[in-house]
């Protein structure tokens, strides 16, 4: 994510998910974007959607675990 313009980067991730709603990678990117901008609940939603499409992604599993740990 672009640290100089995180909201613009987030909009690009959102457009990517709009164009490719069943892409695990697009959903992961949006989840990471929300994570980087401090929107943890939204990040969890999209990371979990990504994982539902591609359950064999250890990186996304780790991101979800980290977010859930920080939320508790």
Locate the predicted segments by residue.
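Conserved structural position within tetratricopeptide repeats
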Residues: 14-18, 51-52
């Amino acid at each position: 994510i672009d640290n100089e313009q995180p909201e613009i980067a987030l909009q690009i991730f959102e457009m990517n998910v709009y164009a490719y709603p069943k892409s695990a990678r697009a959903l992961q990117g949006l989840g990471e974007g929300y994570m980087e901008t401090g929107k943890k609940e939204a990040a969890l939603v999209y990371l979990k959607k990504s994982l539902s499409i591609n359950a064999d992604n250890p990186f996304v599993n780790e991101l979800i675990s980290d977010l859930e740990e920080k939320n508790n």
